[in-house]
């Protein structure tokens, strides 16, 4: 048994310009090879493009997109008696936001287009409207959980 105490849960810091935790979570997920300044550049350009496209507050569009993509329930592989079942589990808010951000970035990376800022802004605007690959991924996850509802007692 470990003698160390339980680690304190770190609170998510907010970014320097918008003072927003979601923006910081997005920056930390888009980060590659430790190039944080480049990640900030991409996010801020995407936010400016959202401002130009929608002519509304870009942070509210970001919040709306993440809220739209955040799943309520997901499936987890659980091995029972030699066979693996997809067991539906409820997801907490932090984990749901993390999944939503991961799906948004994955969908924007797959998009054809000029640069990452443009692709990310397009995906965020689409997600806020209720369309796009990330929304489809959420719906697919919900369908999967609904289909495997019979295994919910394996939790």
Curated annotation (Swiss-Prot):
InterPro entries: Ribosomal_uS7, Ribosomal_uS7_bac/org-type, Ribosomal_uS7_CS, Ribosomal_uS7_dom, Ribosomal_uS7_dom_sf
Keywords annotated in UniProt: Chloroplast, Plastid, Ribonucleoprotein, Ribosomal protein, RNA-binding, rRNA-binding
Subcellular location: Plastid, Chloroplast
Residues annotated as signal peptide: none
Pfam families hit by this protein: Ribosomal_S7
Top-level taxon of the source organism: Eukaryota
Recorded GO MF terms: rRNA binding; structural constituent of ribosome
SUPFAM superfamilies per record: Ribosomal protein S7
GO cellular component, one term: chloroplast
Gene Ontology BP term (one): translation
Family matches, as NCBIfam families: rpsG_bact (TIGR01029)
Listed PANTHER family: RIBOSOMAL PROTEIN S7
Subunit structure: Part of the 30S ribosomal subunit.
Function: One of the primary rRNA binding proteins, it binds directly to 16S rRNA where it nucleates assembly of the head domain of the 30S subunit.
Family label: Belongs to the universal ribosomal protein uS7 family.
The protein's name in its UniProt record: Small ribosomal subunit protein uS7cz/uS7cy
Species of origin: Buxus microphylla
Gene: rps7-A
């Amino acid at each position: 048994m470990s003698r160390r105490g339980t680690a304190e849960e770190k609170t998510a810091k907010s970014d320097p310009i918008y003072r927003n935790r979601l923006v910081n979570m997005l920056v930390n997920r888009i980060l590659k090879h430790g190039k944080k300044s480049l990640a900030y550049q991409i996010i801020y350009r995407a936010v400016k493009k959202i401002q130009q496209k929608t002519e509304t507050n870009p942070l509210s569009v970001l919040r709306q997109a993440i809220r739209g993509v955040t799943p309520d329930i997901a499936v987890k592989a659980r091995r029972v008696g030699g066979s693996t079942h997809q067991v539906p589990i409820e997801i907490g808010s932090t984990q749901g936001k993390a999944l939503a951000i991961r799906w948004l970035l994955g969908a924007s990376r797959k998009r054809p287009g000029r640069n990452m800022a443009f692709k990310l802004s397009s995906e965020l605007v689409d997600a806020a409207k209720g369309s796009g690959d990330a929304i489809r991924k959420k719906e697919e996850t919900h369908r999967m959980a609904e289909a495997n509802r019979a295994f919910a007692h394996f939790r």
